[in-house]
């Protein structure tokens, strides 16, 4: 039962992390593209971007002030700019490998080992190709992978 709970938690986290990653990535692009922005412009654009990717299912009444500087909790913005998107890219690759394994375990494992054997000798798109997964971050591809995760979640 504990294993099931842990799996459920991990799969739910996988689904919910992507909007946050997109928010952080888009916001930091805006910040660097507008180096002379004011504090007020930063606040306005953060909230605009946050609302673009956030769900309306949560009532944030009374927390407006907190939301306006919530971006500060993401230390990557300060310590390793433009790195946070890497987590999303890696997670999508992992889901693609998992889906491939679920569809064809033998081929999935073979492709996984092939990708691993190349290590850092190839570009990321080439590693994805060697592993038999698409280096594709289109809404359609992400939707396909999220449906797969949702289906796996429902099996628990």
Predicted feature locations:
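C-terminal, non-catalytic "cap/extension" segments appended to globular domains
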Residues: 1, 21, 25, 33-156
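Helical catalytic core of nucleic-acid polymerases
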Residues: 1-10
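A short helix-loop-helix "switch/interaction" segment in the helical subdomain of ASCE P-loop NTPases
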Residues: 11-15
């Amino acid at each position: 039962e504990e294993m099931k709970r842990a799996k459920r938690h991990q799969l739910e986290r996988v689904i919910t992390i992507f909007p946050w990653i997109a928010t952080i990535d888009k916001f930091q692009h805006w910040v660097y593209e507008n180096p002379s922005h004011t504090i007020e412009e930063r606040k306005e654009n953060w909230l605009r971007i946050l609302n673009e990717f956030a769900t309306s299912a949560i009532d944030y009444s009374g927390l407006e002030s907190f939301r306006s500087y919530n971006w500060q909790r993401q230390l990557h913005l300060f310590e390793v700019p433009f790195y946070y998107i890497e987590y999303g890219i890696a997670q999508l690759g992992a889901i693609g490998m998992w889906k491939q394994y679920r569809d064809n375990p033998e081929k999935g494992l073979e492709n996984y080992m092939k990708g691993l054997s190349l290590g850092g000798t190839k570009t990321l798109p080439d590693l994805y190709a060697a592993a038999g997964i698409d280096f594709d971050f289109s809404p359609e591809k992400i939707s396909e992978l999220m449906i797969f995760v949702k289906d796996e979640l429902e099996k628990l």
